[in-house]
Amino acid sequence: MSKLHEYLKSQESLITSSVEGKTLIDFINRNAEEYADYPALNTPANSEYSAWDSMSWSEYRDAAKNLASGLIDLGLSPGDTAFIMSNNTKEHNISDLGIVYCGATPSTLYKQLKYNQIEYVANLMQAKVAIVGDLELFEEVNKAKKDCINLQAIVLI
């Protein structure tokens, strides 16, 4: 056992007591209040990764809550499920958190899936909303939508 592992094991009860009964939303809200202007997400500003765009904790929370408001208007409710098909971008992270703010469960689907595979997974998870990162993915999910029992909306980010 490494020294780090031993140390973490010795701190287990302290760590557990500090997070017990709290949710992800509790911690996002705390960070947005206590660390409002600190970076929460960093995204490459160019393909060479020589510059980065940052989004602060308060901007991240506000963007997720704004998306959640729209998702609720589309019918997403606590206990529902939604999926995201997108590159690993800040919009993907905002979408994931926005779904959580609705009280729904997010899932990420591989971008390489074709419409029949999307249909299968969407029906299996009873997805109510799909969030996609580009027009090509929108078209693929839209083909699957007609045979998806619960899928009510596709959101293009």
Question: What are these model-predicted stretches?
Answer:
Residues 28-55:
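AMP-dependent adenylate-forming
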Residues 1-28, 44:
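Flexible, non-catalytic linker and terminal segments flanking ANL/adenylate-forming cores
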Residues 50-55, 68-113, 123:
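Conserved AMP-binding/adenylate-forming
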Residues 24-31, 63-67:
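Alpha-helical packing segments of well-folded alpha/beta enzyme cores
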Residues 101-157:
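Structural core segment of the AMP-binding/adenylate-forming
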Residues 24, 56-57, 115:
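Structural motif detector for alpha-helix initiation sites
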